């Protein structure tokens, strides 16, 4: 019988939950507002309500996987310091949910970028590769490493933080405090600011009309829409972003000798407006011996990979520990 798990993507604005089949992927899904400003207790109440909803009528669910921002301990039970989640200094999610659920269930927590990478590896475009680097472009820049179809976590579980890798030691500071980190260029807020400066004197750009003459309202989504309509200014901004991404990925490839790269997250919807520049830049920043087989692809499953990966985390854990669910 095909195993099922509940996969949860805990985002800053939305909690997305799905019932995941090991063989076919997402069966059904639901989402509710996170309400992160209410603090961890209320947010965990909402997570528990989604778990309860999916367990009703699905007695064969073998566990719950949660992808969350912030630092995750090695045991995959505790979330510490997730950005934009007030009061989450260190929250033992496993214990908190156990006290809220009528029936105990295996619960695992993973960094959200790691969960997305695992989802891509088993249900998305990443299934073509046994090893790849995952980059997620959204509010911030996330990263993960898949090595032989499993998450590579490093010595303490925090490997893969590509967003904190620097491309300019005297550059602008990212939220992490790292000067010139790639997130300081490609994070949503930073990219929008760069677009404002770049387009300020290009009065013929569609962006002025789309933002109703107030460039403070520019978003990455607007850039993509304008590029689709042929706006050269928007295309230039997205190509600039792709160039920066290619620079940092060159360092990652040189370090890891992993030559396949999957790009996901909301900004990845801009597709080749970003990725063409990434590919053409990347080749110039990778040592010749590692240039063979380089490939940069867009994740086609969108934001579903977070839920899928969180669910698959459960299946992988059961297999690794030789556990047969009751």
Indicate residue ranges for each PLM-predicted region.
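Short beta-strand scaffold segments in enzyme catalytic cores
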Residues: 15-19, 141-146
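A short acidic Gly-Thr/Ser loop motif
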Residues: 8-13, 136-140, 158
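A charged helix-plus-loop insertion that forms the helical arch/lid used to bind
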Residues: 77-90
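ATP-binding/phosphotransfer module of carbohydrate and carboxylate kinases, centering on a glycine-rich
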Residues: 1-63, 72-78, 97-105, 119-130, ...
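A short acidic/small-residue loop/turn micro-motif
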Residues: 34-35, 87, 159-161, 167
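Adenylate-forming
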Residues: 116-122, 143-145, 164-165
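General beta-strand structural signal in soluble alpha/beta enzymes
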Residues: 106-111
């Amino acid at each position: 019988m095909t195993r099922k798990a509940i996969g949860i993507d805990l985002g800053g604005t939305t909690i997305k939950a799905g019932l995941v089949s090991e063989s076919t992927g997402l069966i059904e899904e639901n989402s509710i507002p996170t309400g992160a400003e209410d603090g961890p207790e209320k947010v965990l109440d909402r997570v528990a309500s989604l778990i309860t909803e999916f367990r009703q009528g699905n007695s064969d669910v073998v566990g719950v996987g949660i992808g969350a921002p912030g630092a995750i301990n090695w045991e995959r039970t505790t979330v510490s310091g997730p950005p934009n989640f007030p009061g989450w200094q260190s929250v033992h999610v496993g214990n908190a949910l156990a006290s809220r659920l009528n029936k105990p269930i295996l619960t695992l927590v993973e960094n959200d970028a790691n969960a997305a990478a695992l989802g891509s590896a088993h249900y998305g475009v990443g299934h073509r590769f046994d090893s790849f680097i995952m980059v997620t472009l959204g509010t911030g820049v996330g990263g993960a490493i898949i090595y032989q179809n499993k998450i590579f976590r490093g010595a303490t579980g925090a490997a893969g933080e590509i967003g904190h890798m620097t491309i300019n030691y005297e550059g602008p500071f990212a939220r992490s405090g790292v000067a010139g980190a790639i997130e300081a260029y490609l994070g949503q807020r930073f990219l929008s600011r760069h677009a404002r400066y770049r387009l300020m004197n290009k009065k013929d750009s569609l962006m002025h009309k789309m933002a109703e003459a107030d460039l403070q309202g520019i978003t990455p989504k607007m850039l993509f829409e304008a590029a689709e309509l042929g706006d050269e200014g928007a295309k230039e901004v997205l190509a600039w972003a792709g160039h920066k991404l290619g620079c940092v990925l060159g360092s990652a490839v040189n370090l890891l000798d992993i030559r396949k790269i999957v790009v996901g997250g909301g900004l990845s919807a801009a597709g080749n407006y970003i990725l063409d520049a990434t590919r053409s830049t990347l080749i110039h920043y990778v040592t010749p011996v590692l240039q063979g087989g380089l490939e940069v692809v867009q994740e086609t499953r969108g934001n579903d990979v977070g839920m899928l990966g969180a669910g698959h985390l459960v299946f992988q854990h059961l297999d690794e520990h030789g556990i047969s669910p009751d």
